[in-house]
């Protein structure tokens, strides 16, 4: 039952235009076409870019493999893009896989033994590696060696294979789920942060050029403001706004055109969609601002509990519109203000409102 709820939550997330997860293989192909190829083309993440630039330059000067890199942060911020940039900047090949795909030690061994000197192996969702596969990875990361078993039963024996020096780039949205032994083997650990509207506007402008779409600065900024700090969402919204501009306007994406297109898509000024507003309005109007238990809230809006916890709540909490308390969910003063409602007269939200004044 729990697994079914998780699958339902993932399906709901994929359907939302403001979801940070890739919606389809077609969208993944679209992302690849817009992906920057070099570090100089990569917008945002200034600290991470600066660190990688120094570490890669030093490794190239010594003709060594770059130290192993762990990239973590919310989905859609550019972890896969950075892995490709690292390989291109280092002038080596990139092999890409993901944690769930590597089911057996032999799957990983086949990848490792086919790597050439200083190549990059990119493992997405590395937190989902199985324990038996992870055990094989430890000596590979430390000593560039793996132990494989040949034969079965009493005749089985362990054979040590030497590997070419390589760089593992691991990406995860859940760094806390990595085991300590695996985390400790990464020499470079970088957290990707949400983007500012100004940074996203630069990304939207760059993507518009690649799509041969005409956009003005105000139009790019309007899209950026509603993209929840995530380049993947910004590029997805840009595609839909471009369609609107070509059909309903003169093909030029102005602030007014972007606003009309995003209103048609039910994406409001802070990046909320219908589901976000439905959740907040239920707490505000049906439960007087809260607190309300998660099961009551799920019943009130007709969604699964996992959908609320995994898909809807994280962004609302992060942006300060919702709080989780021991007694249940509580709408904050920002939620009241967003919907043009007056200050609550009493209760836990009253204190939050007073704190914001």
UniProtKB/Swiss-Prot annotation:
Amino-acid positions noted as binding DNA in the UniProt annotation, renumbered to this chain = 305, 324, 329
Q: Which GO terms describe its biological process?
A: DNA recombination; DNA repair
Identify the EC number(s).
3.6.4.-
Q: Provide the organism lineage as a comma list.
A: Bacteria, Pseudomonadati, Pseudomonadota, Betaproteobacteria, Burkholderiales
Its predominant location is cytoplasm
Q: Write down what this protein is called.
A: Holliday junction branch migration complex subunit RuvB
GO molecular function annotations of the record? ATP binding; ATP hydrolysis activity; four-way junction DNA binding; four-way junction helicase activity
Give the family, as the similarity comment puts it: Belongs to the RuvB family.
Which residues lie within the region annotated Large ATPase domain (RuvB-L)?
4-195
Binding, ATP: 34-35, 76, 79-81, 142-144, 185, 195, 232
Gene Ontology CC annotations of this record: cytoplasm; Holliday junction resolvase complex
